[in-house]
Amino acid sequence: GLTGLAGRWMKLGDEPLRVCDTGHNPGGWHYLSSQIAGLHGRKHIIVGFVGDKDVEEIMREIARYNSGARFYFTAPSSHRRLPEDELFSIARSAGLYGRTFASVTEAYEKALAEAGKGDSIFVGGSNYVVGELLASLRC
């Protein structure tokens, strides 16, 4: 369910449903992946990470439940960022496909443009990614 904590399974809007979460480790993604799979419609998943996380394991967790989703790979503006092209390569090795975006905002705007009213958009992977999105939306 939706929590009262900013950035934790936080609902950003409806039609399409938009949710973000700051989960950023394999354990968190084990839970998140099944939560995302339970969202309605086609899933549009925007992810970005910092470079010190076990992204290979996280991508495998995502793929367990969400291999049919549309992915938008990005990176936070932090100096610790995992570049989006590296994330794209890691994701492909886990069987996930999508496109890369230079910024979180660009990825979010593209997902909004492509998602239907009955679809769901998820944004996560790092506190930085969610923070940048919330700042751009002025939440």
Enumerate the predicted regions with their spans.
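Active-site-proximal loop/hinge segments that shape catalytic or ion-binding/gating pockets
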Residues: 126
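C-terminal helical cap/extension that packs against the catalytic core
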Residues: 17, 59-120
